[in-house]
Amino acid sequence: MLNIKTKKKNKKRIYVFNKNPEFKFKHLVFQKNKFILKIINEIDKIDLMRSEIFNSTLPIDPQTGNILVRFRKLNRNRLLAIKAIIQAMLYHFNIKTKKVTASVEQLADECGLSTVSKSGNKSITRASRLISQFMEPMGFIKCKKIKTTNNKFSKEIILTPLFFMILVKNSSLSEGDTHLKQEFKILKNKNVHINSSETFAKQEILKKIINKYSLNKLKKLGPKKIKEKINTEYKNIKK
């Protein structure tokens, strides 16, 4: 009797199916705001990993308002994915309403973050988790559930001032030519209020609070008391 030895193949589990997600838009002229187009084109020059806002902002659970103790930070794969998502959100951004005019599924498709199984089932989990478990708790976006015509729920995405702050603070975009500066002023006037001095000052105060207290103490304080401390400290500075 022959002893046939079978070699077991070491199959590595694939955690990320597309390691290099990239935003690919269909219509070149959809977004006409020159300032936003410049951000889209120069997203690779923005160093999000070293961002003071990224490193000092406390993630807040949008449902409960509590600080998220266990929170997944950016790694290389998530960084590439978030840059692609940022580009897509900006591309579909309506300045008047502050809303993204694309669904999560559309954003996932355009960024290469959606997958289709062998059975034909589509998954947009990677994009939806990035939006609901990272961008929203960090305060970069706000999500609202809306009822669609087929009685299902979809997410309405609103870009916050912090979303733009992180992009402008970590790039040379604010040092651009006069025309782009004018575009940025127009963008601010159209209900996207970005008070850079106040926001930056409050982020610095927040950073000091984080360094001063332990994680358990911060959790006990809660977002409301932390916000009160920040506002009190900011008023004292302005006196």
Swiss-Prot record:
Q: Any transmembrane segments, and where?
A: none
Q: Which family does it belong to?
A: Belongs to the IncFII RepA family.
Instruction: Look up the record and give one Gene Ontology term from the biological process aspect.
Output: DNA replication
The protein's matches in NCBIfam families, at most eight in alphabetical order, are given as: RepA_IncFII_LM
**This protein is called what?**
Probable replication-associated protein repA2
Q: Which Pfam families match?
A: IncFII_repA (PF02387)
What species does this protein belong to? Buchnera aphidicola subsp. Baizongia pistaciae (strain Bp)
Query: Keywords in UniProt for this one?
Result: DNA replication, Plasmid, Plasmid copy control
Task: Write out the function statement from the record.
Answer: This protein is essential for plasmid replication; it is involved in copy control functions.
Q: What domain of life?
A: Bacteria
Give the gene that encodes this protein: repA2
